[in-house]
Amino acid sequence: MNTAIVYISSDSYVMQTGTSIYSLFENNMHIKKMDTYVISTGISERNKKKLRDIAFRFQRKLDIIDEEKLIEKYEFGGGG
């Protein structure tokens, strides 16, 4: 079974996000395949590295996707 987890965070909330990711990885080592994503709404490169370091420590994959790239890839908006 493949498990997918998605977070949305900014620099203002990245410490809590990192704590949650650490707990997720530490308490779910029995799950072999876990895809974890963070949608960044302004996370600094320094803090992105810290999040990636957590994933590396647990040998997990963590994808960080910038919000702007999602908006460019998909057309979001109101109206028809």
Predicted regions and their residues:
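Short loop->beta transition adjacent to catalytic acidic/histidine clusters or analogous donor-positioning motifs
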Residues: 28-37
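N-proximal low-complexity "stem/linker" segments adjacent to membrane-targeting elements
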Residues: 1-26
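Short secondary-structure transition/capping motifs
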Residues: 9, 13, 36, 40-41
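N-terminal cationic-hydrophobic initiation segments that often serve targeting/anchoring roles
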Residues: 25-29, 55-56
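A structural micro-motif
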Residues: 3, 34, 60-62
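Active-site-proximal specificity loops/subdomain of glycosyltransferases
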Residues: 40-80
